[in-house]
Amino acid sequence: NDLRLFYGSCFALITTAFSFAIYAGILPQLGEDFDLSATQLGFITSMWLLGFPISMILGGLFYHAIGPKRIMQFAFFSHTIGIILAIYSGGYAGLIVATLLIGIGNGCTEAACNPMIADSYTGKRMNTLMNRFHMWFPGGIVLGSLSSLFFTNLSLGWEVQMWYIIIPTVIYAYLFYGQEFPKPRISGDAAIVKN
C-alpha cells in the first residue's frame, strides 16, 4: 500500500512536470491558433504560476484537517477539468481558467504528496524516497519537453500534447484509488502554530 501511494505520488509529480514543459512547448501554437499576443500568452502562463502556490499554501494549512486523500482527489479533479477545458476552450478566457485549474492541481500535488511520504516512512528510507520523489519534477520536465518537441516535429496539434498530460493523471488516480492514506504523525494544531 505504501509503495503504491509512493508511485502514485511520483506520477502526480510527473503530471505537474508535464504540464509545465508541454505548456511551454505549445505556447507558439496557441498564439497562432487563437491570435494571442505575447502579453496574453504571458498572462496565460502566469495562471499556472498563480494556482500553484495558492493551492500549495492552502493545501499545506489544511493537510491535517482534510488529509492527503481529499487533497489529491481535488488535484485529480483540477488536472482533469483543466486539461479538458484547455483542449475545448476555444479562446483566451477558457485558456486562462484551464491553466489556473492545472496550476491548482499541481499545487495540491505538492501539498499532499510531500507530507504523505514523510508520514509513511521514517529515517533513511524516508530520505531516500523523498529524493526519488523529487527527482521526477526535473525528470518529468525533460520527458515532457522531449515529448513536446517530438509531437511538434510530427506536426501534431497542441491538443494532442494536452491529451498526453492526461496519461500520468489517470495513472496516479488509478494508483491512489481505494488505498488507505497515512494519518499525519503530528497534530494539525502543532503544524499550524509552527507554520
Annotate the PLM regions.
Residues 54-93:
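Conserved MFS/SLC helix-loop-helix module at the cytosolic interface between two early adjacent transmembrane helices
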Residues 21, 48-57, 142:
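Residue-level signature of mid-helix packing/kink "hotspots" within the transmembrane helices
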Residues 4-38, 114:
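Extracytoplasmic
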Residues 177-195:
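Flexible cytoplasmic inter-helical loops of multi-pass small-molecule transporters
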Residues 124, 129-181:
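Helix-loop-helix hairpin linking two adjacent transmembrane segments in secondary transporters
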Residues 17, 21, 103-111, 142:
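Small-residue-rich segments within alpha-helical transmembrane domains of MFS-like 12-TM solute carriers
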Residues 98-135:
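Cytoplasmic helix-loop-helix junction between adjacent transmembrane helices
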Residues 52, 78-83, 102, 168-172:
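MFS 12-TM fold signature
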